[in-house]
């Protein structure tokens, strides 16, 4: 940046490009190694040039969940690599871009920032025409290759106005003095400052899921949600509080996995990939005073459950597991029609025991029911302890039928002996 001074106003000019800047007016800047104050016109009296071995190649990668198989890798080589290590590579991940089209400009800017002082000159003098970004031609240096075009990237002006005689003692310095210090790069170098470190988030944060008024679930095609952070003073707990934020699920496969979208009002835990404040992700959910667990605790601490809530309603679906000692059970239930499949020790959840309803299984509903099996259906009261055979095994049933057949034969024979009707088989 630099200041432009006019008669009626002063302007602060900021730019992210050097090559679009002007050249200074008034001809070349002169160099003279004479001591300060011994030159009749403004000059640069000190010129120190240095070269530093810096990054010669920049490689960057990044990741986007929208294109997970594409590495978004970009390679750029520096310019003017004389006296440099051409194999000196810097590899950065993440590259701070999510679209490949932005990758090259990011990589280019990063490389230039790392090479900002690969070729640099430090000067001092009293020519006030030096302005950051404005090129000038240097003349008068004993090394001909230094008499070239340069651009200042940093200028420090220092001026002093000493007090008058009436204010200080007779031996106090009088008049004014001015000098400057500047850093220069060759005019053809598109200079960039050092890359700034990315602000890092120290650990996860708590937030509340938000969305439009009247909604209970608000997400996009990726299952992302929006949240309101407790520290946010500007948000209004609506769909504009944050950007879309990804949600971690227990399973996530190709058309398979677990899916449970955080609902508006739920408290969630938000973490940040690589500590990057621009890459939040919901990693968990927590209960709180306004969102209590499905069953009172610690009374029902032996229960494990997955219980949903009817969208814009009050009913629920639930998969419940009861691990009560010697009375374990599982149940799959829906409030619609009071439909349920209960397995094991049949009873309702209870903190201090309850009246048993039976043992085994119960499939029931207040609505209609149907059992269909295209390839056969076996209903039997014969035991098959611990599922020791195939689920359609009919060995025991055949034995019963054979015993019944034998009994029928015996009864037939007995009837024939006593003048009854003979049997058919």
Predicted regions and their residues:
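Amphipathic alpha-helical and helix-coil boundary elements used as assembly
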Residues: 1-425
């Amino acid at each position: 940046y630099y200041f432009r001074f006019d008669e009626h106003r002063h302007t602060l000019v900021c730019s992210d490009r050097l090559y679009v800047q002007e050249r200074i007016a008034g001809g070349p800047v002169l160099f003279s190694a004479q001591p300060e104050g011994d030159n009749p016109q403004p000059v640069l009296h000190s010129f120190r040039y240095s070269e530093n071995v810096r990054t010669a190649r920049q490689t960057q990668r990044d990741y986007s969940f929208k294109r997970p198989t594409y590495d978004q890798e970009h390679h750029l080589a520096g310019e003017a690599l004389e006296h440099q290590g051409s194999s000196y590579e810097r590899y950065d991940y993440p590259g701070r871009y999510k679209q490949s089209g932005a990758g090259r400009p990011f990589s280019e800017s990063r490389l230039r920032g790392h090479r900002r002082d690969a070729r640099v000159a430090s000067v001092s003098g009293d020519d006030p025409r030096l302005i950051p970004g404005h090129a000038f031609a240097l003349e008068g240096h004993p090394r001909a290759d230094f008499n070239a075009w340069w651009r200042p990237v940093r200028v420090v002006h220092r001026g002093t106005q000493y007090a008058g005689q009436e204010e200080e003692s007779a031996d106090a310095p009088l008049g004014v003095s001015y000098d400057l210090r500047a850093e220069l790069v060759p005019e053809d170098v598109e200079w960039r400052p050092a890359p700034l470190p990315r602000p890092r988030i120290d650990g996860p944060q708590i937030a509340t899921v938000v969305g439009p008024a009247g909604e209970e679930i608000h997400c996009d095609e990726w299952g992302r949600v929006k949240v309101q952070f407790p520290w946010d003073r500007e948000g209004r707990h609506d769909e504009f509080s944050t950007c879309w934020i990804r949600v971690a699920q227990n399973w996530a496969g190709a058309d398979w996995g677990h899916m449970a979208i955080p609902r508006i009002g739920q408290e969630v835990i938000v973490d940040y990939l690589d500590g990057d404040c621009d890459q939040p992700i919901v990693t968990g959910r927590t209960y709180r005073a306004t969102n209590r667990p499905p069953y009172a605790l610690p009374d029902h601490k032996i229960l494990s459950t997955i219980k949903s809530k009817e969208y814009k309603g009050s009913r629920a679906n639930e998969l419940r597991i009861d691990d009560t000692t010697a009375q374990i059970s599982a149940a799959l239930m829906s409030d619609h029609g009071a439909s349920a499949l209960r397995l094991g020790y049949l009873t309702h959840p209870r903190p201090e025991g309850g009246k048993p309803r039976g043992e085994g299984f119960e499939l029931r509903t207040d609505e209609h029911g149907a059992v269909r099996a295209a390839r056969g259906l076996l209903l039997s009261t014969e035991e098959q302890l611990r599922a020791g055979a195939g689920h359609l095994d009919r060995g025991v049933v055949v034995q019963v039928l054979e015993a019944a057949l034998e009994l029928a034969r015996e009864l037939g024979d007995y009837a024939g002996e006593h003048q009854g009707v003979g049997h058919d088989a």
